[in-house]
Amino acid sequence: MDNRTLTHLRQLEAESIHIIREVVAEFENPVMLYSIGKDSSVMLHLARKAFYPGTPPFPLMHVDTTWKFREMIEFRDRMAKEAGMELIVHINQEGVAQGIGPFSHGSRVHTDVMKTQSLKQALDKYRFDAAFGGARRDEERSRAKERVYSFRDRNHAWDPKNQRPELWRLYNGQVHKGESIRVFPLSNWTELDIWQYIYLEEIPIVPLYYAARRPVVERDGTLIMVDDDRMPLEPGEEPEMAMVRFRTLGCYPLTGAIRSEAATLPEIIQEMLLTKSSERQGRVIDHDAAGSMEEKKRQGYF
């Protein structure tokens, strides 16, 4: 296909669909990690397009930390059913037994045990040799230098100095037993591209992305939504009802909201055109230490 005849978004769409089909052709047991966010929603939409009118020939998998927003879980179950795809939900039961949580153990331990170790458990349990993820290069520095086909060793570790060249959109999927590839079909998309494509394709997303009055408390400059009664309030702390939305979604105690009036897709896109801050500024886990995302990825984080 001549790219000169395609719009910018259609070029990105064609590239992503090509990557998804390549993985299915190359690997024996792929899986699509479904984190329920806007990028996962776009990736799922592209996968369904890639194999329409059939169903994508791989399952969805959600690594559930047990601390996701309630609206995210409801949306996850609905979308998996609508897509007609198998949904694997994996929870690190060892972490649950130890009572690991963001309040009791802090974001660093919680993320390592309930996300990184849980993901590695699931990949080993089901013996997946390729895993799709919705990460984009414009999100964060360590992701900016990651390949579309990101090689992981037998311990699921990522070595940024040992990456394979990807010339002329040719991807090397050769792995030995126990090794795997993390695949990022949205690598070349930007946050604005994602929102424009959601608008163009009318892709359903979690309502938390739209501005609404929600109960929040401000901690260390971050607006945290009080999503259930597990969140301990500090002395004298009272949740305020504020017009907020989320640019990125994760565990609710570790995800900051932004004050916003953008309640429709056109309003969100307009807001994106004017903003100068990173979408991950609201992710508490990114504030653990300098380079913390790269360190997490070296240990097996997505």
From Swiss-Prot:
InterPro entries found in the cross-reference section: PAPS_reduct_dom (IPR002500), Rossmann-like_a/b/a_fold (IPR014729), SO4_adenylTrfase_ssu (IPR011784), Sulfate_adenylyltrnsfr_sub2 (IPR050128)
SUPFAM superfamilies documented for this protein: Adenine nucleotide alpha hydrolases-like
EC number(s) reported in the record: 2.7.7.4
Catalytic activity: sulfate + ATP + H(+) = adenosine 5'-phosphosulfate + diphosphate
Keyword Nucleotide-binding: yes
GO aspect biological process, one term: sulfate assimilation
Gene3D superfamilies listed in its UniProt record: HUPs
Subunit annotation: Heterodimer composed of CysD, the smaller subunit, and CysN.
Protein name, per record: Sulfate adenylyltransferase subunit 2 2
Organism this protein belongs to: Alkalilimnicola ehrlichii (strain ATCC BAA-1101 / DSM 17681 / MLHE-1)
